[in-house]
A protein has these predicted regions:
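Repeat-mediated protein-protein interaction surfaces in helical alpha-solenoids
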Residues: 20-27
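Sec-dependent N-terminal signal peptides
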Residues: 3-14
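Sec/Tat signal peptide C-region and signal peptidase I cleavage site
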Residues: 14-20
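Compact alpha-helical subdomains of small soluble proteins
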Residues: 65-144
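Generic short alpha-helical hydrophobic face used as a protein-protein interaction/packing hotspot
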Residues: 13, 46-47, 125
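Short N-proximal segments of mature Sec-exported proteins
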Residues: 30-85
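Transition segments tied to proteolytic processing and entry into folded domains
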Residues: 29-30, 126
Length: 144
């Protein structure tokens, strides 16, 4: 968590309104954009997962844990969105659309969502550095 906040502080001067001059700055922006999208995805996964478990009257501790993870990912989604100069209204719309998409999938096959996003989202909440490293590697491959 501290590393993510440190990354945000370091990257802030390179937000979308700044000129991107170096590869490092471009990669840093790429990392923030993709991590922010990951947080939207994981918020949607946790939010929908909590609803699925509530409807199935599953373990209350599991529901509480999913809701807590949803809160964490939503906060970071908005924090990084601010760094990227995204408007709150735009972020709310994107988040709403992603939740709706996940809800439709979950109605037919929640297991596929859990399989695809469960581990990635768990790791994102518990250790953002791993995901930052992932996007840094991808950014270095993509940006020349």
């Amino acid at each position: 968590m501290k590393k993510l906040i440190f990354l945000i502080i370091i990257i802030y001067p390179f937000s979308t309104h700044s000129l991107e001059k170096t590869k490092e700055e471009k990669v840093a922006k790429y990392i923030i954009q993709n991590i922010q999208k990951d947080y939207v995805t994981c918020y949607s996964f946790y939010k929908v997962g909590a609803e699925v478990f509530k409807k199935a009257k599953k373990n209350k501790e599991m529901i509480k844990s999913l809701e807590k993870s949803a809160d964490i990912t939503l906060k970071f989604n908005y924090d990084l969105g601010e760094v990227l100069n995204l408007k709150p209204k735009y972020m709310a719309q994107i988040t709403k659309e992603e939740v709706e998409k996940f809800t439709k999938i979950a109605q037919n096959d929640f297991q596929s969502l859990a399989k695809k996003y469960g581990l990635m989202c768990k790791k994102l909440v518990e250790n953002q550095k791993q995901r930052i490293d992932y996007w840094e590697e991808k950014g270095n491959e993509k940006i020349k």
